[in-house]
Amino acid sequence: MTDLPPEPLRPAVILVDDDPAVAHAVQFSFDLEGLNVRSFRDAESLLASGALPKKGCLVLDYHLPGLDGLELLDRLRANDVRMPAVLITTNPRPHLRARAAAAGVPSIETPLLTDALLTAVRSALAHIEQ
């Protein structure tokens, strides 16, 4: 029997979205693309998990119960989490787009255009793999 080299780890995507249908659709789509998705329903459950990978990408819904997606990102950055992030939201107003841009985060409008979200996540992951 030949020893096979270990399978490379799939890139990690941390998804925080309180809508189960969105979370399921993103998880299914990204799984088909070879991405490893961990889903959380709100900011507090992600923060309590303490299980962030060293490398990966955050996909944060803006409209979360409790902390919104950008407040969650601020909290993570304050705790020295430097993973790239993508913000997803419905009907983003100009002030929200400005806040996301100031945080260095692309925003993708939902209903999700899966290709746009996948492109943004792949771009973020490519930057950390260099």
Regions from the language model: what does each represent?
Residues 71, 91-108, 115, 119:
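Alpha4 helix (beta4-alpha4-beta5 surface) of REC/receiver domains from two-component response regulators
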